[in-house]
Amino acid sequence: PLDFQPGQFIQVHFSYADGTETKRSYSLATIHDHALGPGEAVDIAVSFVPGGAATALFEALDIGGQVSASGPYGRFCLNPGDHNGRYLLIATGTGVTPYRSMLPLLATAMAERGVQVVLLQGARSPGELLYSEDFYSFAEKHPNFRYVPCLSRELPAEPHPDVHHGYVQQALAAFTPDPATDIAYLCGNPDMVDACAEALKAAGLGNPQIRREKYVSSK
């Protein structure tokens, strides 16, 4: 069985063309409420890297094909001992993957503690907003959850009122990070993670309030 905490990742093991062994890490996007048994599917998101070895691996994989993986690993998870008033979830690209798996836990936190949640998701265009339908649907059902797509290039023809034109690090300031209430999660592009971490520190948040995971695309 694969029993994981939302926010954790697995590692896929494979070899380069010359036989050298390597691995890639992928956060689990699966929404689950039990340990996953044989035959049950898990969801991961794989970035397309032109010429990338992992990209070639998955492109050549047939339905029903097998890969070798290990895990789960990682501590980029919601802490049951948190007593904050608001979560700031910030992501670019496939960095939004762990937040999808966290949705049931966030729903519980909102119901039990009245916590507020803001999700800032960065992408270049609407078509690159991974899992956006899930987040919009969740926002409609949970008034304490605000979903803010941040699009750096192309805007939709009829943008939702919460759509921001620009980068997530630019949109962050509008939500006035508050060290008295906030815990922030940063996941995705390393430059974004660093920029947002510095902005949060400048706002007064301490290191324990800033939880981060950087995604680096490799060939």
Predicted features, each with a name:
Residues 117-219:
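Reductase modules of NAD(P)H-dependent flavoproteins
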